[in-house]
Amino acid sequence: MSQSPKVGFVSLGCPKALVDSEQIITQLRAEGYEISGSYDGADLVVVNTCGFIDEAVQESLDAIGEALTENGKVIVTGCLGAKSSASGSNLIEEVHPKVLAVTGPHAVGEVMQAVHSHLPKPHDPFVDLVPAAGIKLTPRHYAYLKISEGCNHRCTFCIIPSMRGDLVSRPVAEVMLEAENLFKSGVKELLVISQDTSAYGVDVKYRTGFWNGKPIKTRMTDLVAALGELAAQYGAWVRLHYVYPYPSVDEVIPLMAEGPFKGHVLPYLDVPFQHAHPEVLKRMKRPANAEKVLERVQKWREICPDLTIRSTFIAGFPGETEEQFETLLDFIREAELDRVGCFAYSPVEGATANDLDGALPDEVREERRARFMEVAEEVSANRMQRKIGKTLKVLIDEVSAEGGIGRTAADAPEIDGVVYVEPAAKASKRYKVGDFVSVKITGADGHDLWGEV
């Protein structure tokens, strides 16, 4: 029997791009292609790119160039594939004219067509080798679940809609089937992602779908409840990311705090507030009522005292005054957000914010970002200290002779903190990657925790 054709794969960018990569690799394996771990062992290479900020664009272009140098046969997909150069031509084809094909994001069919054109699929694929959950690039015990593509917002600093298009929600039955297959495969934590999780179903007017004969509206609250019910059957977690602060978010908080989904729909919200001053938010084309946001945060915590709120912000946006920046710092102190990231504003080619007046010097933007993070880290450290002495449920991510490393309900992988657990030899019971263990917290800093099983 002839040897199966081999495809190399490079995946860059955010978790949503990672899911695109997983879907492409799943289809490749389903058709009998093998995935090569090296350039020289591959018959061709697929590069999934990011094009959100200038650094990501350069990283993607460099990765394409490296793949061309090391292999020579390269197919490009992802957000950068939808980006034009200053001359109006495709940026990738202009910089790297030797690539075999270029597609935009979430284009599994187009990528497979390009692969077929340059590397025909084998006649006898081993379909049974592909698990129902698909091929995942994350560790076996957690996975990302993408529920929609695109975004209907037109934030002035963002070009995602120009690359990924308007919101397109996945059918609820399709989402639930993928979630079930993931839980069956041993996944202990599902991280729900999209460009705008709160808007799930807006594009289909919240139509009713069916899962195992049960009606479920294509709507965030209904989907989260269904996922929570499913997660409870497997003793697993569901974590919500990219939750735009719509009023509908208020309906999800009780699912985290009480009833059958408590402990499965995690008390964790990733909400991108971006700023707190109404004038800056207006220039960003974001919701512009910080006082109402503070009231909602307080209400959420009254309903769900264990709630962890993560958010991201932009410092040094065009036109931002020192007074407006101080308003942002006051908001961080008063809201007491648990996990916070901040970017110094950086112009993105194609973003309408580039046309705004009041651009700030690089040193001012960076200085404000640094001041922001000082305040945010102080707030985080104070909140982390309150956890000392508590016993928390921890999902183990790593185990070594030095002990275990895991995460609580307050910690998403890659972006939040971890819990350093005492060495396994001293633990009251053995544990392995993917296990849930109860850990008594003995120490904390501004980011991480230490504890004993």
Swiss-Prot record:
* EC numbers on record: 2.8.4.4
A biological-process GO annotation: tRNA modification
Q: What Gene Ontology molecular function terms does this protein carry?
A: 4 iron, 4 sulfur cluster binding; aspartic acid methylthiotransferase activity; metal ion binding; protein methylthiotransferase activity
UniProt: [4Fe-4S] cluster 1 binding residues: 14, 50, 79
Q: Which residues form the TRAM domain?
A: 385-453
Which cofactors are required for activity?
[4Fe-4S] cluster
Which Pfam families does this UniProt record tie to the protein? Answer: Radical_SAM, TRAM_2, UPF0004
Q: What class of enzyme is it?
A: transferase
Sorted alphabetically, the keyword list is:
4Fe-4S, Cytoplasm, Iron, Iron-sulfur, Metal-binding, S-adenosyl-L-methionine, Transferase
Family, according to the entry, reads as follows: Belongs to the methylthiotransferase family. RimO subfamily.
Its recorded name reads Ribosomal protein uS12 methylthiotransferase RimO
What gene name is given for the protein in this entry?
A: rimO
